[in-house]
Amino acid sequence: MSGLSERRWDKEERKQKILDSLKNGLIVSCQIQPTDPVYSMDFVVKMAKAAKWGGAAGIRANSPDQIREIKKAVDLPLIGLYKIFSPVSDVFITPTLEAARQVWEAGADIIALDCTDQINEAGQPAWKLLPVLKKEIPEALIFADVSNYDEAKRVVELGADLVGPTLYGYTEQTKDIEQPDLRGFARMCRDFSDQAFMVMEGHIYTPEDAVKALYLGADAVVVGSAITRPHLITKRFTDLMGGLQDNWRKAERESINHLPPRNEEDLPED
């Protein structure tokens, strides 16, 4: 067997091992942003430890530093991304090849990136990074974050390993959405589950919603804000109890969009 063939075999074997470990499981998104009241490296690591204690099958984490620290503390498969915000583009999830390289070098098992039709800072549709990344880091597993069926179809054809409607509710076309698109996701699963690992991510706030996603064909489910962001959990309660006068979804969306860049070395330890 040639060296290239061996590498391909190793990737397929590693890929299957990782995906098997995530199958039918909960992936907890453990992320902190500079505007979060709980913003500290210590907190994000403890979130990941708590997720493992609770039975999570994997972790989704943001930024090389946070990925690195979580990998030191928790031995679960890790989906890594790098949120980089731009004043001229809505693409912020691992928007460049360099960002993807940093995620990979930090120890992520899977690289997540925006694969929507949104235009990136370079003036290209975000999804065009996918084939570039597959060529430049061929051993990496790639999680394509999309917002609709057509985007999912495209990334499956381009060879994404994992696909999820992560950005449903975060694009200009879907920004006012409050509920998961279970019907659209079910269609994705019916059409693409034999070609990619289908992950339900986005607007899952209860265990019952997660079970629905599995029933509809999800291979795994990602939950973030409903588990790991106490200020947003509180905001949802106060909004609902206050007669829906204070839009909790808007607060959630604004908490991750268009934040000013900040150096990770400025992150407090506790």
Regions found by a protein language model. Name each.
Residues 49-55, 111, 133-139, 192-195, ...:
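Short, surface-exposed connector motifs at secondary-structure boundaries
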Residues 58-63, 67, 79-81, 109-114, ...:
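Short beta-strand segments at enzyme active-site cores
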Residues 178-179, 185, 227-254, 259-264, ...:
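C-terminal helical cap(s) of enzyme catalytic domains, especially alpha/beta-barrels
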Residues 198-204, 222-226:
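Glycine-rich beta-strand-to-loop/alpha-helix junction loops that act as flexible
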Residues 3-101, 105, 150-157:
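Conserved N-terminal beta1-alpha1 strand-loop-helix module at the mouth
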Residues 38-40, 60-76, 91-95, 115-133, ...:
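Active-site-adjacent beta->alpha loops and helix N-cap segments on the catalytic face
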Residues 23-26, 74-88, 134-144, 191-201:
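Short beta-strand/loop segments at the ligand-binding rim of alpha/beta enzyme cores
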Residues 31, 85-86, 106-120, 162-175, ...:
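Glycine-rich phosphate-binding active-site loops on the catalytic face of alpha/beta enzymes
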